[in-house]
Amino acid sequence: MATQAMATLIDRAMDYSYAGEQEHFRNPLYPQGVTYTKGVRYVAEHAGGGAGWLLDKIGTMQAHPQIRTEQLTQLWSLWVTEERNWALICQDGDYHLMWAEGGSYTDFPVGHITFFVQHGCIMLTSEY
Protein backbone atom coordinates (compact mmCIF):
# COMPACT_ATOMS: atom_id res chain seq x y z
CA MET A 1 0.00 0.00 0.00
CA ALA A 2 1.35 3.41 -0.93
CA THR A 3 1.99 5.95 1.77
CA GLN A 4 0.95 9.57 1.43
CA ALA A 5 4.54 10.49 0.52
CA MET A 6 4.60 7.94 -2.33
CA ALA A 7 1.15 9.00 -3.56
CA THR A 8 2.20 12.66 -3.52
CA LEU A 9 5.44 11.88 -5.38
CA ILE A 10 3.59 9.98 -8.10
CA ASP A 11 0.88 12.66 -8.40
CA ARG A 12 3.45 15.44 -8.76
CA ALA A 13 5.46 13.45 -11.29
CA MET A 14 2.28 12.88 -13.30
CA ASP A 15 1.52 16.62 -13.18
CA TYR A 16 5.05 17.28 -14.42
CA SER A 17 4.58 15.18 -17.55
CA TYR A 18 1.88 13.73 -19.76
CA ALA A 19 1.32 10.76 -22.04
CA GLY A 20 2.94 11.27 -25.42
CA GLU A 21 5.56 13.67 -24.03
CA GLN A 22 8.20 14.30 -26.68
CA GLU A 23 11.04 15.64 -24.50
CA HIS A 24 13.36 12.82 -23.42
CA PHE A 25 16.62 12.96 -21.50
CA ARG A 26 19.78 10.92 -21.84
CA ASN A 27 22.55 9.99 -19.42
CA PRO A 28 25.95 9.24 -21.02
CA LEU A 29 26.44 6.37 -18.54
CA TYR A 30 23.51 4.46 -20.01
CA PRO A 31 23.76 2.27 -23.10
CA GLN A 32 23.24 4.05 -26.41
CA GLY A 33 19.59 4.73 -27.14
CA VAL A 34 18.36 4.64 -23.52
CA THR A 35 16.33 7.73 -22.63
CA TYR A 36 13.89 8.77 -19.90
CA THR A 37 10.92 11.12 -19.63
CA LYS A 38 10.26 14.28 -17.62
CA GLY A 39 8.12 12.33 -15.14
CA VAL A 40 10.89 9.82 -14.47
CA ARG A 41 13.36 12.68 -14.10
CA TYR A 42 11.03 14.27 -11.53
CA VAL A 43 10.88 11.04 -9.49
CA ALA A 44 14.68 10.65 -9.61
CA GLU A 45 15.18 14.22 -8.39
CA HIS A 46 12.46 14.36 -5.71
CA ALA A 47 12.03 10.89 -4.15
CA GLY A 48 13.49 10.82 -0.66
CA GLY A 49 16.93 12.41 -0.78
CA GLY A 50 17.01 11.79 -4.52
CA ALA A 51 16.56 8.55 -6.40
CA GLY A 52 19.18 8.84 -9.08
CA TRP A 53 20.33 5.37 -8.00
CA LEU A 54 17.00 3.90 -9.17
CA LEU A 55 17.13 5.57 -12.57
CA ASP A 56 20.80 4.58 -12.90
CA LYS A 57 19.99 0.95 -12.06
CA ILE A 58 17.21 0.73 -14.65
CA GLY A 59 19.25 2.61 -17.26
CA THR A 60 22.49 0.69 -16.90
CA MET A 61 20.70 -2.68 -16.67
CA GLN A 62 19.58 -2.15 -20.27
CA ALA A 63 23.03 -3.48 -21.26
CA HIS A 64 22.56 -6.72 -19.26
CA PRO A 65 22.19 -9.64 -21.72
CA GLN A 66 18.95 -10.92 -20.19
CA ILE A 67 17.36 -7.46 -20.10
CA ARG A 68 18.67 -6.29 -23.48
CA THR A 69 16.74 -9.04 -25.28
CA GLU A 70 13.39 -7.63 -24.10
CA GLN A 71 13.12 -4.26 -25.84
CA LEU A 72 9.38 -4.28 -26.52
CA THR A 73 8.13 -3.91 -22.92
CA GLN A 74 9.76 -4.14 -19.50
CA LEU A 75 8.06 -3.45 -16.19
CA TRP A 76 10.34 -2.28 -13.38
CA SER A 77 8.68 -2.31 -9.95
CA LEU A 78 10.16 -0.95 -6.72
CA TRP A 79 8.70 -1.87 -3.33
CA VAL A 80 9.82 -0.13 -0.14
CA THR A 81 8.76 -1.45 3.28
CA GLU A 82 8.14 0.46 6.51
CA GLU A 83 11.55 -0.86 7.66
CA ARG A 84 13.10 0.91 4.61
CA ASN A 85 14.03 -2.38 2.90
CA TRP A 86 13.59 -2.38 -0.86
CA ALA A 87 13.09 -4.82 -3.71
CA LEU A 88 13.40 -3.97 -7.40
CA ILE A 89 12.21 -6.45 -10.03
CA CYS A 90 12.09 -6.43 -13.80
CA GLN A 91 9.46 -8.37 -15.70
CA ASP A 92 8.86 -8.74 -19.41
CA GLY A 93 5.55 -7.77 -21.02
CA ASP A 94 4.11 -11.17 -20.10
CA TYR A 95 5.04 -10.66 -16.41
CA HIS A 96 7.87 -13.23 -16.47
CA LEU A 97 10.60 -12.38 -13.96
CA MET A 98 13.79 -11.30 -15.72
CA TRP A 99 15.82 -9.83 -12.85
CA ALA A 100 15.51 -8.94 -9.15
CA GLU A 101 17.57 -7.18 -6.49
CA GLY A 102 16.97 -5.98 -2.96
CA GLY A 103 18.61 -3.96 -0.26
CA SER A 104 18.38 -3.13 3.41
CA TYR A 105 17.99 0.66 3.22
CA THR A 106 16.61 3.42 1.03
CA ASP A 107 15.13 6.83 1.73
CA PHE A 108 12.73 6.37 -1.19
CA PRO A 109 9.13 6.78 0.08
CA VAL A 110 7.45 3.67 1.49
CA GLY A 111 5.18 1.99 -1.02
CA HIS A 112 5.33 0.80 -4.61
CA ILE A 113 6.07 2.41 -7.98
CA THR A 114 6.30 0.88 -11.46
CA PHE A 115 8.09 2.15 -14.55
CA PHE A 116 7.73 0.98 -18.15
CA VAL A 117 10.70 0.65 -20.46
CA GLN A 118 9.72 0.45 -24.09
CA HIS A 119 12.22 0.56 -26.95
CA GLY A 120 14.83 2.00 -24.57
CA CYS A 121 12.65 4.78 -23.10
CA ILE A 122 12.08 4.70 -19.32
CA MET A 123 8.68 6.17 -18.44
CA LEU A 124 6.05 6.34 -15.73
CA THR A 125 3.05 4.08 -16.25
CA SER A 126 0.94 7.23 -16.75
CA GLU A 127 3.23 8.32 -19.60
CA TYR A 128 2.78 5.08 -21.54
Describe the residue ranges of each PLM region.
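Short, compact, well-ordered microdomains
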Residues: 88-128
